[in-house]
């Protein structure tokens, strides 16, 4: 089927080499202000032909709004988005129309529909994911405005190149913003010299080996990890890097979406070598949903993990998903794996909503959190205090310069010209009746660790939802292989056309959008049963405490 959701339904349509692709969102709330520029920015993060690391199919992926809005405000009627296909070269596929491509759905598609796929991968192409990015980027603006919920995905590994273990743990506790993911994941490539330059200006050779520190590298930057290890530079490293990387001159800007500069350089080197050889590679992407309301998820067959798994596994090339400790948890004892409960005490003045996790609230009692919500830990890949402050990055990846890399809230909303809070008077979602605190005498419990990945018994705990997706190597490779045609005859095949060597750099906005769709539907299902009084969240409690 092409529809996901129970109350909030998203339907996608169109084929990879058809005239257009699109989606319909049904069941979305009325009177929600949507900034179409934010949707377009997420589409831009996903689109092909971004750099030498991605497919050279030149699709601008410009969003076309067909229905569901009065200017920028939803009507409560079906929302329809359309994206034209503009770079279709069908002749690239004519030479192997009778040969099912290994790793693709050509054979199974034929057996199911009795139709040979003459061009591209039709409905089974990764091209379809542009439609869910449009839908999810719309839905997540509502999630952020009403629940302060933010979602970020980044590349954890490509092949055997992965984030350092401590850096990965720190990111799962304090998620980086999308701005930071794109800033630290950007690498300048000087093809003539065969050198790479990372976020901090450090220079590496074609194999990703450190050569020298750059003039713009902040004090404390070391080739060991490619990141600053001490001090608080007076200059803004994010703004400086943006200025350097936005005007590469004779260099090419590569985007990995791996928020660790040294790892990003190694990924670039590896992918370019594989692309030259005509091969492909997969990897792992990590997604973190922050400030998800407590208590959403439906037993037994529609648990939060099950629903997330369903939509994430529907993304082409995704072959697996794990939550929290995942498969590593099988090596742990129950005494180590169990997440113990504690109470949440939100300080009157302290970390802002973004960059503040449940374990941070507990750790603040022991003085382990700095005033800006950052956590100084050895091996972290960035200064969290600086990177999560507003105004530190104009916008490399998505959301306007509120500095969070997430949809704006309140008077910062770009569609709100008056500076007043967005309209929340919709009778179907009455925020004035919403109880943001537990009943008298009860405490909002949180877990001091997060091996469960923010979900227990299929229901959200309020901790960060953390999951990782396993991505297989791209099936279309330019290495000749012996296979069989539809008639059982041996033949040789070398796939031509416009394909990615590795889809990981384009994957984060797809996973972010898919996660938004699931959370949005689950929230509406909970509200339909119990109302907003049963939707406490850490973000709302933080606001009510300060107010």
Curated annotation (Swiss-Prot):
Matches recorded under Pfam families:
Chorismate_synt (PF01264)
Task: Provide one Gene Ontology biological process annotation.
Answer: chorismate biosynthetic process
What pathway annotation does it carry?
Answer: Metabolic intermediate biosynthesis; chorismate biosynthesis; chorismate from D-erythrose 4-phosphate and phosphoenolpyruvate: step 7/7
The entry assigns this protein to a family as follows: Belongs to the chorismate synthase family.
Might you give the EC number(s) for this enzyme?
A: 1.5.1.38, 4.2.3.5
Question: What Gene Ontology molecular function terms does this protein carry?
Answer: chorismate synthase activity; FMN binding
Q: Which residues form the active site?
A: 17, 104, 500
Q: Which UniProt keywords apply?
A: Amino-acid biosynthesis, Aromatic amino acid biosynthesis, Cytoplasm, Lyase, Oxidoreductase
The chemistry this enzyme catalyses reads: 5-O-(1-carboxyvinyl)-3-phosphoshikimate = chorismate + phosphate; FMNH2 + NADP(+) = FMN + NADPH + 2 H(+)
**Domain of life of the native organism:** Eukaryota
Subcellular localization, per the record?
Answer: Cytoplasm, Cytosol
Role, per record: Bifunctional chorismate synthase and flavin reductase. Catalyzes the conversion of 5-enolpyruvylshikimate 3-phosphate (EPSP) to form chorismate. Acts also as a flavin reductase (FR) able to generate reduced flavin mononucleotide in the presence of NADPH.
**Official protein name in the record:** Chorismate synthase
InterPro entries reported in the protein's UniProt record: Chorismate_synth, Chorismate_synth_AroC_sf
* GO CC term (a single one): cytosol
Coarse class of the protein's main subcellular location? cytoplasm
